[in-house]
Amino acid sequence: MNAPLNSAVRLDSIEEAIADIAAGKAVVVVDNEDRENEGDLIFAAELATPELVAFMVRYSSGYICVPLLPEDCKRLNLPPMMGRNEDVRGTAYTVTVDANTGTTGISATSRAETMLRLADPMSVVDDFTRPGHVVPLAARPNGVLERDGHTEAAIDLARLAGLRPAGVLCEIVSEEDPTTMARSEELRRFSDEHDLKMISIEQLIEWRRHNETQVRRTVETQLPTDFGSFTALGYKHEIDGQEHVALIAGGVEELNGAEDVFVRVHSECLTGDVFHSRRCDCGQQLHQSMEIIQEAGQGIIIYLRGHEGRGIGLLAKLKAYSLQDSGLDTVDANLEQGLPEDAREYSVAGQILRDLGIKSANLLTNNPHKGEGLRGFGVEASAHTPVEIEPNADNIDYLRTKRDRMNHDLPQVARWDAAHALK
């Protein structure tokens, strides 16, 4: 049985993969074990050669696809293969095609010609016959940041290599067991044997988040609050449309180049922030952070939308509460729904801090690992300042779980337990 893909398998850098794509080579791209758990050979369609296609056919399923942007599918009149897409992964297969200059259409030479035509911005509908032996795929316009599939990875790699956004892909078959697909260590051995770079879609997602800007500052205004006056900056994510807010104390311009700035990265919590729920300490942490920042005279509150329930959404969080009422803890209540323990990611916060220009942050958080992802955005987490909120009878179990299973720094839990053990 093939081992699943995991972090123990050595991966190459995204920069190396981009360089090889630009040089006309293929790379191996793997996805998550919870998805297809497969590796695809991928190269740029505009650099297709009979030799590349023959290599791909030899080591793959042979069902070769060419991801294209939706506008190219429309330009070439490539409608969906089916009116209703029932593919479990949502892969957008279109009608199959051959270049009209080929012979049988199935040879490596003929398929390479079809790929070149599909990648050519000057090609037209009549350059192809239908049906054929090459399967175009309609990729999501925003690549792996919109859908974490090989289709989008192929488009992104070609674009990042400075080439037309059109790729070629096919799943690699196991040589150890040709009845199944290659996975994990076998993909690494295959890559090394053939001098190919191997990367993951997860790597590509993180690379794009760190090296591109998806959030834009759209508005600035003054916001007087019960805790003092802040400058409110509105940010909008250009891909998912989510709107986020940064509250600034001490002036926006003064943050550029500033060090050891108090920063609270706060995840949206309707129940805690607005309804003052006693099941969590979110609203109290937010308010205490605003007080700390006002007392310091400088600081940033980043309010991240879309983080409700550690990223699982409001209704799923309410369902998790119901499961907790039945005896599960906050972690298992998520897992019981088939949801991750914590679905949040903080690239938006990193991009906002990069936009503001601070050099280092004193993070107001009880999570000692929260600053690990900021370094990639040019911000050092120079210190962590706990935000200690005294427990109550309704949230003590929740806080114990955060301490014991999520490694949060919560000394107040021990104080509560000691005090109540004496009663």
UniProtKB/Swiss-Prot annotation:
Residues annotated to bind Zn(2+): 269, 280, 282
Residues that, per the record, bind GTP: 264-268, 285, 308-310, 330, 365, 370
An example molecular function term from Gene Ontology annotations: manganese ion binding
Residues involved in Mg(2+) 2 binding: 36, 150
Annotated catalysed reactions: D-ribulose 5-phosphate = (2S)-2-hydroxy-3-oxobutyl phosphate + formate + H(+); GTP + 4 H2O = 2,5-diamino-6-hydroxy-4-(5-phosphoribosylamino)-pyrimidine + formate + 2 phosphate + 3 H(+)
Catalytic-site annotation from UniProt: 342 (proton acceptor), 344 (nucleophile)
Positions of the record's site feature: Essential for DHBP synthase activity: 133, 171
Biological process according to GO: riboflavin biosynthetic process
Residues where Mg(2+) 1 binds: 36
Pfam families referenced in this protein's UniProt entry, alphabetically: DHBP_synthase, GTP_cyclohydro2
Keywords, alphabetical: GTP-binding, Hydrolase, Lyase, Magnesium, Manganese, Metal-binding, Multifunctional enzyme, Nucleotide-binding, Riboflavin biosynthesis, Zinc
Function: Catalyzes the conversion of D-ribulose 5-phosphate to formate and 3,4-dihydroxy-2-butanone 4-phosphate.
PANTHER family: 3,4-DIHYDROXY-2-BUTANONE 4-PHOSPHATE SYNTHASE (PTHR21327:SF18), GTP CYCLOHYDROLASE II-RELATED (PTHR21327)
Name used for this protein in its record: Riboflavin biosynthesis protein RibBA
Naturally occurring in which organism (per UniProt): Corynebacterium ammoniagenes (Brevibacterium ammoniagenes)
Name of encoding gene: ribBA
